[in-house]
Amino acid sequence: MLKEVQEVKVGGRTRRVHVRPFAWGLKNPSHMEWTPDGRLLVSEHTAGTVRDITKGGDASEAKPLVYNLQGPAAIRPTEDGKVLVAETWGGAITDIAGGGDATKLPKLSENLKGPYTLAVLNTGKKGETLFVSESSSSFMTQITRLSLGNHEREPKAFILDIPARHGEPGLTPPESWPDKWEKYAAAGCVKNWIDDAAGRGFFYLAVGSLGQIFRINPDELPEKITYSELVAHPNALVAWGLHRLGGMRFHPSSGLLFAVQPEMGEVIAVDPAQPGNYHFQPPVVRGLRMPTCVRFSQDSEKMYVCSSADGVVWEVEGFLT
């Protein structure tokens, strides 16, 4: 049960965390992102829409910003004004900056395998590089990269053979029931999530099914690497022993990484500077119904958490020590 005021013990101190509904009436909200012009967008994964929830409130009657998307997931703005969204069921990455009917909007990349989460790194002279999580099979995922500059955009596999597990039938398109739901759900919210660490030249990778978080610096790794090789790489693994992970976000001012544990209904804080086993780490927030994504207000004082099961984005205050 979700309590509006929760008492959380952190470092021997007890503090109060306030949890309130910020936006509601959403259909399976799965991912959020801020645009450079200050809009907070949310993907409605099974509804095929992206909505602007900047002002909060009842979103059920508001006209969607974009519609006719096929399983919209991660949203990621780029330096050149694009607003990219991963279409998981459509196998594409679409630029939704123009809004409206997604079938008429430009595709950055197609023929991908269940693209789900996105991260963008600026690699200097080569410009921005997009990293995408894909489903290589029902039980394996991979991280693929492609250039956003005036270079070859052919997707190239980067991290291979990352363990995963299938999701739930209710998070798949109706045409997949009952025979193909496992194929679609493999690219659902049990996939591996990535976060670009607020432009620090590396990204974090959550291997959700194993409760692990890695720090990925492409300059320190080979052009192509497997999950088993990554585990053995020094200083890559920053957290383990967690429950199944969903979305996460780096909090710049505190240096902490906040991640959701959907099946536990919790948000947990991880300190990447102190790698370790976080199995017994108390959550920052508990009692949520299937939380999938976390973002912060532009002043970093408030946390927003998607709750896909009840169609609500929650606003959390007091989560910082």
Predicted features and spans:
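Tandem-repeat architecture and repeat-register "anchor" residues
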Residues: 29, 53-56, 72, 96-99, ...
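Beta-propeller domains
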Residues: 42-57
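Short loop/turn segments that connect beta-strands within beta-propeller blades
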Residues: 53-58, 96-101, 147-152, 217-222, ...
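A short helix->beta-strand "capping" segment at the edge of beta-propeller domains
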Residues: 2-25
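Beta-rich, blade/repeat-based domains predominating
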Residues: 24-39, 67-83, 87, 109-129, ...
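Structural signal for beta-propeller blades
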Residues: 48-51, 91-94, 138-143, 211-214, ...
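Short loop/turn segments immediately following the C-termini of beta-strands
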Residues: 45, 88-89, 135-138, 208-209, ...
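A short beta-strand motif characteristic of beta-propeller blades
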Residues: 18-23, 60-66, 103-109, 154-161, ...
